[in-house]
């Protein structure tokens, strides 16, 4: 159950922002294997003075169209899977909405089931971790 935080320069259209969000989600479904309905994303638009980055870090020329993506997800995936996810996100963003691969900056932050509460202050994912029990959330009373 990942959550993706996406930062980009203010002024992009709603369709552009949605295409970025869709590309990230579709890559997670395809490469990580999350269910299609497991979608939690935050898009933050920033003015140029609040989006600070090195335009040539490690020799990669970045433009004003940089997209910074931080994905928090449960740990344990192989290095190959993580690298494949980076590549697939960059490829999908290049395809639609046309983000240059040089402008795609991704960081994965891994954690544990105990770090997630998906509603009502409950942590049902811990049951899976602690007891191997199926994950379900009881109806609200």
Go through the PLM ranges and name each one:
Residues 1-141:
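Interaction-mediating elements
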């Amino acid at each position: 159950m990942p959550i993706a935080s996406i930062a980009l320069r203010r002024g992009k259209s709603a369709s552009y922002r949605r295409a970025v969000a869709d590309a990230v989600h579709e890559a997670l479904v395809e490469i990580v294997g999350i269910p299609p309905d497991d979608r939690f994303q935050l898009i933050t638009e920033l003015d140029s003075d609040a989006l600070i980055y090195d335009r040539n870090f490690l020799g990669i020329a970045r433009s004003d169209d940089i997209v910074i993506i931080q994905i928090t997800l449960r740990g344990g995936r192989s290095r190959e899977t993580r690298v494949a996810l980076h590549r697939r996100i960059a490829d999908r963003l290049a395809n639609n909405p046309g983000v240059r691969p040089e402008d795609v900056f991704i960081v994965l932050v891994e954690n544990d089931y105990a770090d997630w509460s998906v509603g009502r202050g409950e942590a049902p994912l811990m049951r899976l971790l602690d007891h191997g029990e199926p994950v379900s959330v009881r109806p609200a009373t």
